[in-house]
Amino acid sequence: MSKSKVLLVGAAGETGGSIVNGLLDDGNFDVIALIRPGSIQKTSITRLVDKGIQIRKCDLKASEEHLIEALADIDVIISCVGPAEQQDQIPLAKAAKKTGVKRFVPCGFITICPPGGIMWLRDEKEIVYNQIRQLWLPYTIVDVGWWYQLAYPRLESGCIDYAMTSGNDEIVGDGNMPTALTDLRDIGRYMARIISDPRTLNKKVLAYNLVSTQNKIHELMEELSEEKIVRNYVPEETICSRMVAARQASETYPFDPRKFIPRYMAEYQFSCGIRGDNNPEYAKYLGYHTTQDLYPDFKPTDFREYLESVIRGTAVGIYQDRIISRKHQRHFPRTGSSDSLYTRIFPRTESSDSLMSR
């Protein structure tokens, strides 16, 4: 039986990297990465080649003719583009329709949230989803909740700074809002099942490992680390004020993706921490299938064990090429072990490609 040919857009990003690993480990897929011609020499692309990933050179902004050529003999497309590039997927979807792609997985991979003005990023994605449906292109939309890797607070000792992307020192509202969590590394394992499953064709799927709250996560971190964590509760009024200010600051011309980062943060906090959107029960209400219902035999990474690895110093940090902006540095007490924390968050390059890659 021949393997399914999967074309991955954004294979060098965090989500894309997880999917690469999950598909390769499964063994039933030929994995091909669509790479911009100008990015071929990057170290991250060399690492893909070393894993045995085939490379096809094409830019999402290329002509339809070139996109169609790049999609020759592809069965499944999985897109992991950055927030600023969501609508660049539309020409790719049109080319996929013309080449007979059997399943298109657009770039979802965020928390649960209904469209219509709550999260700019959600609304950008929904524009793409609607275009796909208008094309009558077979699709699967996958969202993944909030990553383990972004869910835990900083410890005062600085011993886990090496693995952190930000201080994560705020508890939204009363801290008791349930939210779906997923280990980034499990996303690829879920995707190997989802794209092989006829039940998920033309459906929405929430892939998640467990449901927890910020308060419970703080308590667990205190138990495991034997350190006291100061609770910094941020009321709904403050979150809403930030969101309004961030929206006003971001709505400028020309489009500047850097101005949207405070907006993403505020809107995520509002949706997940105040509204409680990122909940499997709400996802089902919105029409999602869940991986816990679809794949009851799936063994997810245990959250407690993951946090133990973070505290031991054996976890792997994410967004290793990012640096924290000067604006955000003041939120991090500088200790001997936290200097490396300043190498996270925003990219060293000013290009929107690296800034917004997922």
What function would you assign to each model-found segment?
Residues I53-I74:
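Conserved Rossmann-fold cofactor-binding substructure of NAD(P)-dependent oxidoreductases
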Residues G82-P83, I311:
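Short glycine-/small-residue-rich Rossmann-like dinucleotide-binding loops
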Residues M1-F29, G38-G52, E64-E65, K97, ...:
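Eukaryotic N-terminal targeting leaders
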Residues I68, L184-A192, P300-E308:
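Short, amphipathic alpha-helical "lid/cap" segments that border enzyme active or binding sites
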Residues L71, D75-S79, V105:
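N-terminal Rossmann-like NAD(P) cofactor-binding module of classical short-chain dehydrogenase/reductase
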Residues T238-H328, F332, S337, F346, ...:
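A hydrophobic C-terminal alpha-helical subdomain
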